[in-house]
UniProtKB/Swiss-Prot annotation:
GO terms for cellular component: plasma membrane. This is Uncharacterized transporter HI_0680. It comes from the Bacteria. It is found in: Cell membrane. Belongs to the EamA transporter family. The chain crosses the membrane at residues 5-23, 33-52, 72-91, 101-120, 127-145, 149-166, 175-194, 207-229, 238-260, 265-284. Keywords: Cell membrane, Membrane, Transmembrane, Transmembrane helix, Transport. Residues 13-144 form the EamA domain. It is a multi-pass membrane protein.
Length: 298
């Protein structure tokens, strides 16, 4: 398990660093960076399919699409939802929105807990229920003080919740399905990449090609590390360690000069408290499982 924790932390560190790394790719726009990230990351996704023995599952899904072409629409929809989130992740640090996106990632687990209860009738623990209430109070305070959440935070919460909910409802939660979602994004990614005027870009950033290849390497390595960790760790612990990435995103936001305005303090404090409660819940459940396993061995 210790190795799994280290691999998960590596994935979170790489994803968090990528948030900062996008600021080194100027003068490329968020759309340009997104296109090249998808192109350079896709080979790593294919490698992951081979490494984690998902080729049979991928072939089976392709055969299903061949027999029932309308199934391709589900992968296209999920691909678009996921792709927009990836674009926003790379766009935000260069456009003064990294804190808003970080707030969205802080709120996301709480929204997913609520969605799980409403749409999938999942049970909510006491800790998570309190976390949902506190996060809701934070959102209400932001609506009263600022008129609402930022559009970036709303897109993160609703977009990712819709993405994961659709995948769960259609039972398309494996790596093979993710590969097809990435494949659906290749045409638009290539189009975005071809629109880049590299002659102009290289005058400002002569090392841009090397930096883009490095972006793909960071993104691909992070993806593979996360998949490895997901196979080595319980889901509760994996989700708990995922908060490391969110914390790093907040640190990056402060590092590049963004500041929390006074009207956002109540929301920030409520989200941090909610995050801590979700983490406590994860630790508690994981500890209970370990104790139960020890009793079984006796």
């Amino acid at each position: 398990m210790f190795k799994g924790i280290l691999v998960s932390l590596l994935a979170s560190f790489l994803f968090g660093y990528m948030y900062y790394f996008s600021t080194l790719l100027k003068p490329l726009s968020g759309t340009d960076i997104f296109g090249y990230r998808m192109i350079f990351t896709f080979p790593f996704v294919l490698l992951s399919v081979t490494l984690f023995k998902q080729k049979a599952a991928l072939i089976e899904r392709l055969k299903r699409i061949q027999k029932r072409p309308h199934l391709a629409l589900s992968y296209l929809l999920c691909g678009l939802l996921m792709g927009f989130q990836m674009w926003l992740f790379l766009w935000a640090p260069n456009n003064g929105s990294s804190l808003s996106v970080s707030f969205g990632y802080l709120l996301l687990p709480i929204v997913m807990v609520a969605a799980g209860r409403v749409f999938f009738k999942e049970r909510i623990s006491t800790f998570k229920f309190i976390a949902v209430i506190i996060a809701t109070l934070g959102v209400i305070s932001n609506i009263v003080l600022k008129g609402g959440l930022s559009w970036e935070a709303i897109v993160i919460c609703l977009g990712y919740t819709a993405y994961f909910s659709i995948r769960k409802a259609l039972k398309n939660t494996d790596l093979a399905s993710f590969c097809l979602e990435m494949l659906s994004l290749m045409p638009v990614s290539i189009y975005f990449a071809l629109q880049t005027d590299f002659a102009t870009v290289q005058q400002t950033n002569p090392f841009i090609w090397g930096x883009l290849v490095l972006l793909g390497l960071i993104s691909g390595t992070a993806l593979i590390a996360y998949v490895i960790a997901s196979n080595m760790l319980p889901m509760n612990l994996l989700g708990l360690l995922g908060y490391v990435e969110t914390i790093m995103m907040l640190c990056v936001s402060f590092l590049i000069g963004e500041q929390i305005d006074s009207e956002s303090y109540p929301l920030f404090i409520c989200l941090v408290i909610a995050m801590i409660l979700v983490m406590v819940d994860g630790v508690y459940k994981h500890t209970q499982k370990e104790v139960y396993k020890c009793h079984l061995k006796k």
